[in-house]
Design a protein with these regions (language model features):
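Formylglycine-dependent sulfatase
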Residues: 1-235
Length: 235
């Protein structure tokens, strides 16, 4: 309902499609394209680095006297983040949260996040001291809420960029709120096949590693149920 309300009160791009990527990361070039307005073949190194000549839209706001705030996933270079945002909190520069095993509380409950560093160094090991029981979405939402509350009475305009990492895998631990879907409520897509129908040059890349092949419908249904549950959790 909250996402629906944002759409109804704002703007929704209903004909937006992922163009693909030049490596296993699809979100990385998509993010760079969204930030710069460039196409897939025009973003630098699949979006790993956003050079100075490719201005991001937060940069343009910042140049026009907006306070720009960023929280959540970035997964491009740190210099571009600091050009784009004058401040931030609970920042994730990686591609995904760490996988764990049945005895470890990892994944979205163990995000490696940085506080905003004006120097742009963001050294590894200097993480936000967050409880392992705090889900990633809560950390990003709390950072955004705190920023709004701090700037509510400020006459200076601001732009806030909030990038949740859920429902990105690993989908290993769910928080105890929001509706949890059961696999019996989820249907398989009509185009489901147990494995890729032809050799595309790399049959063991990224999503193909999430589950063994040939795919078993029951496992796919469980994965899709977790995915929808995490979308509901973000909402």
């Amino acid at each position: 309902p909250n996402m629906d309300r944002l759409v109804n009160q704002g703007m929704s791009f209903t004909q937006t499609h992922v163009m693909g990527g030049l490596n296993g990361a699809i979100s990385q070039p998509s993010r760079a394209m969204l930030l710069t307005g460039r196409g897939l073949m025009d973003v630098h190194r699949n979006g790993q680095i956003i050079p100075k000549n490719e201005k991001t839209f937060p940069e343009l706001f910042r140049e026009n006297d907006y306070t720009t705030f960023g929280t959540g996933k970035w997964h491009s270079d740190k210099a571009a983040f600091n050009r784009s945002f004058s401040t931030g909190a609970n920042i994730f520069f990686g591609g995904m949260h760490p996988y764990g095993n049945e005895k470890e509380e990892k994944g979205h409950r163990c995000p490696y996040l940085h506080e905003y560093d004006p120097t742009g160094k963001y050294k590894n090991g200097q993480w936000v001291n967050a409880s392992l029981n705090t889900f990633s979405s809560e950390l990003y939402a709390d950072a955004a809420i705190k920023f709004i509350e701090t700037n509510a009475s400020n006459d200076n305009p601001f732009l806030m960029y909030v990038a949740f990492t859920s429902p990105h895998d690993p989908r290993n631990v769910l928080p105890d709120y929001g509706r949890k879907y059961g696999s019996k409520e989820i249907t398989m897509p009509k185009n489901f096949v147990t494995q890729h129908p032809f050799d595309n040059g790399d049959l063991n890349e990224r999503d193909e590693k999430l589950l063994p092949t040939p795919r078993v419908p029951e496992q796919v249904l469980a994965e899709r149920a977790n995915y929808y549950s995490m979308v509901n959790e973000v909402d």
